[in-house]
Amino acid sequence: MAKVYYNGDANEKYLQSKTVAIIGYGSQGHAHAQNLRDSGVNVIVGLRKGKSWEQAEKDGFAVYSVREATKQADIVMVLLPDEKQPNVYKEEIEPELQPGNALVFAHGFNIHFNQIVPPEHVDVFLVAPKGPGHLVRRTYTEGAGVPALIAVYQDVTGEAKQTALAYAKAIGATRAGVLETTFKEETETDLFGEQAVLCGGLTSLIKAGFETLVEAGYQPEVAYFECLHEMKLIVDLLYEGGLSWMRHSISDTAQWGDFISGPRIINDAVKAEMKKVLHDIQTGKFAKGWILENQANRPEFNAINRRENEHLIEIVGRELRSMMPFVKEKQKEVVVSSAKN
C-alpha cells in the first residue's frame, strides 16, 4: 500500500527564506499562490500581459514576466496548460534557472513525454492536488485540504522530497493526505482515468443511454433526467463512501439492476478497449497525437467540440437547467475556441 504523508511529515523550513514563482494564474495557479501566501511563503506570479495579470495584481501579488519571475525565484511552479508549457519553458524559464533551483509541476505530462528536458543542475518534482483549484482554495480556507500526489524526478540538492512535502503542506494537501508516486505513474494513470472513466468513458456512457431512450420513443427531457441529471446524486454517494455506500443508499431494485445489468454494459469487450487506451498512453501514441494536433492548430479537436456542443442532450439540458433555479447555470452560451486560456 502507498505511504500517506500528513502535516507532521512535512517541515516548513524547506520553504523558509525562499521565493516561489507561480507561473500561470488560472484554476490551480490562483489557489496555489493564495494558499502559499497564507502559509507564510514569499510568493510572486509570472505571467504574460492580460486579464490574469490584472487579476493577480488585484489579489495583491507582485506580478512579473515569466522570465523575470523565474530569475527571482528559488522554486518555480509551472501551472500553465500542458500544451503551452514547452514553448514558455524553452523561451522564458530555462534560461533563468540557477543551480539548486526547483522546477515543479502539477502534472507530469511534459516531463514524462520529454517535451520539457530539465537541466541537470535543478531539482524537479511534482505536487499534484487531486481536485480543481477552487476546491484547493476553499478547503484550505476552511481548515481542511485536498489530497495530493508528490513525485521526485531529479534530486540535485538532496532535499527535493522534503521540499515537495513542504510545498504540499503549504497549500493544505497534507491536511488531507499526500501519496508518493512517480512522474510515470501520475501521468499515465491520470490520462487513463480521464479518457476511460471520468471524462471519455462517462460522457460516452451518458450519451449512449440518452440516445437509447430517445431512439426508443421516450421524451428527450425524461431521458436527460434519467441519464445525466441524476448522475450527481450517484456520484456524491460514491464520493462519500465508495461503491458499497452508494449501493446501500439506493433502492433494492436499483441495486439488483446494478448487479445484473452493469456487467452487460461494461463487459470484457469494454475492458479490452480500456487496455488498448492504456497501451496508447503507455507507448506515447496518445501524447504524440495530442502534440501534433496542437501543432496543427487543433482542427479535429475544434470540429469534434463543435459537434458535441450541438448534440441533442446539450440542447435539452440547457432548456431544462434554465427552468431549475436550484441549478446554477454554468454555461450561458457555448463559445468554441481553439483554447481555454
From Swiss-Prot:
Active-site residues, Swiss-Prot/TrEMBL: 107
Free-text remark on how the cofactor is bound: Binds 2 magnesium ions per subunit.
Enzyme nomenclature, EC number: 1.1.1.86
This protein's record includes keyword Transcription: no
SUPFAM superfamilies according to UniProt: 6-phosphogluconate dehydrogenase C-terminal domain-like (SSF48179), NAD(P)-binding Rossmann-fold domains (SSF51735)
Residues reported to bind substrate: 251
Residue ranges annotated for the KARI N-terminal Rossmann domain, each copy included: 2-181
Signal peptide start and end residues: none
Pathway assigned to this chain's UniProt record: Amino-acid biosynthesis; L-isoleucine biosynthesis; L-isoleucine from 2-oxobutanoate: step 2/4; Amino-acid biosynthesis; L-valine biosynthesis; L-valine from pyruvate: step 2/4
Start and end residues of each KARI C-terminal knotted domain: 182-327
Cofactor annotation: Mg(2+)
InterPro entries: 6-PGluconate_DH-like_C_sf, KARI, KARI_C, KARI_N, KARI_prok, NAD(P)-bd_dom_sf
Record function comment: Involved in the biosynthesis of branched-chain amino acids (BCAA). Catalyzes an alkyl-migration followed by a ketol-acid reduction of (S)-2-acetolactate (S2AL) to yield (R)-2,3-dihydroxy-isovalerate. In the isomerase reaction, S2AL is rearranged via a Mg-dependent methyl migration to produce 3-hydroxy-3-methyl-2-ketobutyrate (HMKB). In the reductase reaction, this 2-ketoacid undergoes a metal-dependent reduction by NADPH to yield (R)-2,3-dihydroxy-isovalerate.
Family listed: Belongs to the ketol-acid reductoisomerase family.
Listed name of the protein: Ketol-acid reductoisomerase (NADP(+))
Source species taxonomy: Bacteria, Bacillati, Bacillota, Bacilli, Bacillales
Gene: ilvC
